[in-house]
């Protein structure tokens, strides 16, 4: 699918090993006769292959956009799997494993995968049904969505990982707004386009960081290097740059390009020492030289 040229074999080894790692999952869940276990934990049959292990919080940023470029037929099969999981289990996947909704990780990043596939022209006959599933998953009465819709952010005392959820929901909502516009759903376009700007409500212009709010005020004793319950496997350094859908808006919040570049330089030049809890799984990756984008 991808050929690179290099006079150094080690460069080729690194690249192709990384490419191989990127396609270890999702995994085929269909048997040779078309039977598969879906998100209602019952056995179904489909002539189109179905898949499992959609760890979408890990893969929505880069992996699925890569698939949409080099594995277009397989992406259409992923969309068909999403449709079946929606029909059988009642919602689009967030972090699906072997037909189970694991309840793991945040956001509703299946909407990002679907939107990217749609605008990259992945052939699929039922985008409108997936769009209905997008609206449903973005309006559930749990995981901080009600206060997010009411206040324009998630208060830290009402939901864990409030800053990360606010930021990722805003990105997801931008994706939905683009689908709404493409499908001529004006009312939902206006609603979700407004929600996509909610990231601004957790930006503290005095510090230049995305911070938690408690009862409408900035939470006290804030440190951007602290790993705590307000962020998902990260601290404020990583999440303060997570506005992939509105980089120009983020730059404006910082007061322009010069001040934004200054903040980026702070990110890469600050100490990698973290404060707070030791984050399981990726503690070594949480340093200020890395950011969620």
For each feature predicted by the language model, list its residue ranges.
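Acidic/polar loop patches that form or flank catalytic/metal-binding clefts of enzymes
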Residues: 74-78, 125-127, 187-191, 203-211, ...
